[in-house]
């Protein structure tokens, strides 16, 4: 029986049901415990990054190599026919899809990954981030890390801090955790960078508790996960950026009343929002979180490219 993710496009976290998420996370745990260096030995995967990336691109490409796949692609669209000759995204994807078994794609335009699926034929497209919209594979590694550290994905108190308007990671993570029972959210952001209304409406429709706060201190003692984000300079005008960049900064001294097993997560890169003295505390878990990207992305690639995956 084929697994439900075989040859499936993964554009939004909402493309994955709760059962799908559990399957990916279980597969990630197996691959972390038992590496499979030849699982994708005869597959070719395109790594198409139309927007700058460090962790996501290297994590995906490392995942591909560690599963034995061959990797082709680019990290700067300026040096492609699309960038230099004006080729359309549709034509670029139409051609690349004739070469490969899957396409991993990041693009600055919201909806670009969904558009790519219309031109990729039977080749699955995995969204590595489209503008400020979705970042589903970051969410998978976030869920994997939360499950590893907390032992569950339900009945959690989760605080999200910083840029909640443009931060695609918090949109995807909130939608994913809303699929599990009993979770409660605390949103801490300047008014200019508040969580979008459609996310709040979704939580209301599901009867999920949430609240808005003006400081981290207000919720520190309550939370199991403190998810920090940077203010995204590239998505703000200079005056707006200057006003909000230092509004929410986490320091080690702020953690004095945190739960013993509370973990601080961050999608990275960080700028000033987490002081380096936090790194030395047992709550800091963002580097381990980044490392888990290998296993979450390996799991997704393995499932999308293997009809009958047995590990």
Curated annotation (Swiss-Prot):
Q: What is its EC number?
A: 2.1.3.2
Cellular component per GO, a single term:
cytoplasm
Summarize where carbamoyl phosphate binds, as residue positions: 55-56, 106, 135, 138, 268-269
Q: Which Gene Ontology terms describe the biological processes this protein takes part in?
A: 'de novo' pyrimidine nucleobase biosynthetic process; 'de novo' UMP biosynthetic process; glutamine metabolic process; protein homotrimerization
**What molecular function terms (GO) are annotated for this protein?**
amino acid binding; aspartate carbamoyltransferase activity; identical protein binding
> What are the coiled-coil residue ranges?
none
Q: Which InterPro entries match?
A: Asp/Orn_carbamoyltranf_P-bd, Asp/Orn_carbamoylTrfase, Asp/Orn_carbamoylTrfase_sf, Asp_carbamoyltransf, Asp_carbamoyltransf_Asp/Orn-bd
What are the record keywords, sorted? Pyrimidine biosynthesis, Transferase
> Which pathway, per its entry?
Pyrimidine metabolism; UMP biosynthesis via de novo pathway; (S)-dihydroorotate from bicarbonate: step 2/3
Identify the residues that bind L-aspartate: 85, 168, 230
Stored HAMAP family? Asp_carb_tr
Q: How does it assemble?
A: Heterododecamer (2C3:3R2) of six catalytic PyrB chains organized as two trimers (C3), and six regulatory PyrI chains organized as three dimers (R2).
The protein here is known as Aspartate carbamoyltransferase catalytic subunit
């Amino acid at each position: 029986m084929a697994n439900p993710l075989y040859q499936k496009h993964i554009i939004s976290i909402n493309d994955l049901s709760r059962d799908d998420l559990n399957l990916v996370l279980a597969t990630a745990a197996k691959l972390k415990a038992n590496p499979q260096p030849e699982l994708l030995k005869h597959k070719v995967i395109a790594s198409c990054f139309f927007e700058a990336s460090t962790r996501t691109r290297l994590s995906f490409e490392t995942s591909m190599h560690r599963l034995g796949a061959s990797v082709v692609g680019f990290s700067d669209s300026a040096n492609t026919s699309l960038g230099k000759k004006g080729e359309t995204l549709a034509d670029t994807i139409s051609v690349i899809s004739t070469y490969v078994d899957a396409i991993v794609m990041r693009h600055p335009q919201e909806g670009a990954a969904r558009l790519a699926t219309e031109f990729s034929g039977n080749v699955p497209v995995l969204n590595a981030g489209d503008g400020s919209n979705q970042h589903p594979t970051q969410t998978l590694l976030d869920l994997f890390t939360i499950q590893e550290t907390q032992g569950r994905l339900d009945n959690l108190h989760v605080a999200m801090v910083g840029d909640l308007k443009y931060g695609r990671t918090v949109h995807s993570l909130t939608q994913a955790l809303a699929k599990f029972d009993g979770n409660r959210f605390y949103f801490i952001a300047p008014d200019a960078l508040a969580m979008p209304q459609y996310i709040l409406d979704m939580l209301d429709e599901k009867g999920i508790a949430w609240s808005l706060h003006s400081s981290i201190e207000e919720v520190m003692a309550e939370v199991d996960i403190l998810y920090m984000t940077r203010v995204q300079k590239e998505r703000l005008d200079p005056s707006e950026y200057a006003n909000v960049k230092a509004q929410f900064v986490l320091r080690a001294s702020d953690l004095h009343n945190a739960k013993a097993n509370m973990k601080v997560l961050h999608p990275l890169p960080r700028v000033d929002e987490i002081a380096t003295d936090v790194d030395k505390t047992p709550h800091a878990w963002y580097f381990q979180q980044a490392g888990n990207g290998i296993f979450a992305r390996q799991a997704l690639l393995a499932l999308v490219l293997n009809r009958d995956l047995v590990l």
